[in-house]
Amino acid sequence: MEPSLLMWRFFVFIVVPGCVTEACHDDPPSLRNAMFKVFRYEVGTMINCDCKTGFRRVSAVMRCVGDSSHSAWENRCFCNSTSPAKNQVKQVTPAPEEHREKKHTDAQNQTQPPEEADLPGHCEEPPPWEHEREPLKRVYHFTLGQTVHYQCAQGFRALQTSPAESTCMMINGELRWTRPRLKCIREGEHGQASDDAEPQESTEAPPGSGTFLPTRMAGTTNFQKPTDEIATLDTFIFTTEYQIAVAGCTLLLASILLLSCLTWQRKWKKNRRTI
């Protein structure tokens, strides 16, 4: 085998798998009169670093990284003002004590590690960052193995008492969310619980439908009241950087295949001339 072909195949083996991510491209199932929570995030989960109008993000996304022994959020989100005037520091000489305190605070902010999870291998809900666009409407990119927990919206109750959850799994070669078994009826109504009750698809937008409740209580099954802070999960939208990365990986793979074909063709012609 020619050295060039061997090098390209080694390059494909090393680089191309890194371009493939086990991301759940669809949102978790939406149930009528129900909402879901996420207690902890799988390693690989990403959050869009969205900023308010007049500010731009430093990093495109914040990612949960780590392994079974340690996990944390990488690339914390920061928003810088797009106005030069706001970025200018006023030329005011601070008092010595204020200067030392400010210097210590700045150094601490720069060296402070990302938020760590209580449970290794997972990350908790990160705190809001300064100038975040809408903390209650963050855009999450879930990964394989992520589980979300469902509960009925305020004013509704579940017919069954068993936990209702959905997990992103590999099903028939595709990443899909499992169907949660939950049926919610209005409080005061009488209904018969059934283990075979199928989840109802949401055909309208009733109160609490399709909402997202982040929580920092990892590993617990006690739901907060629906009146707590909630966040609507926006439609999954790839960031521009992610689209560019996917396009680059596709172009790279096509180029490698083309070069491999050309190398094989040249080798074949060379062998034919020798014969």
From Swiss-Prot:
Record's compositionally biased regions (Basic and acidic residues): 96-106, 119-130
Pfam family, one: Sushi
Domain Sushi: 22-81, 121-186
Topology versus the membrane: Single-pass type I membrane protein
Superkingdom: Eukaryota
Gene3D superfamilies reported for this sequence: 2.20.28.230, Complement Module, domain 1
UniProt keyword list: Disulfide bond, Glycoprotein, Immunity, Membrane, Receptor, Repeat, Signal, Sushi, Transmembrane, Transmembrane helix
Residues exposed to the Cytoplasmic side: 263-275
Location (main, coarse): membrane
Subcellular location: Membrane
Annotated region described as Disordered, given as residue ranges: 88-130, 188-221
TM region(s), chain numbering: 244-262
Signal peptide residues on this chain, from the entry's feature table: 1-21
Any one GO CC term of the record: membrane
GO biological process: immune system process; inflammatory response
Keyword Signal part of the UniProt annotation: yes
Disulfide pattern: C24-C64, C49-C77, C51-C79, C123-C168, C152-C184
An example Gene Ontology molecular-function term: interleukin-2 receptor activity
SMART domains: CCP (SM00032)
Extracellular side stretches: 22-243
InterPro entries, per database record: IL-2_rcpt_alpha, Sushi/SCR/CCP_sf, Sushi_SCR_CCP_dom
Assembly information from the UniProt record: Non-covalent dimer of an alpha and a beta subunit. IL2R exists in 3 different forms: a high affinity dimer, an intermediate affinity monomer (beta subunit), and a low affinity monomer (alpha subunit). The high and intermediate affinity forms also associate with a gamma subunit.
PANTHER family: INTERLEUKIN-2 RECEPTOR ALPHA CHAIN, INTERLEUKIN-2 RECEPTOR SUBUNIT ALPHA
Protein name per its UniProtKB record: Interleukin-2 receptor subunit alpha
Native organism: Bos taurus (Bovine)
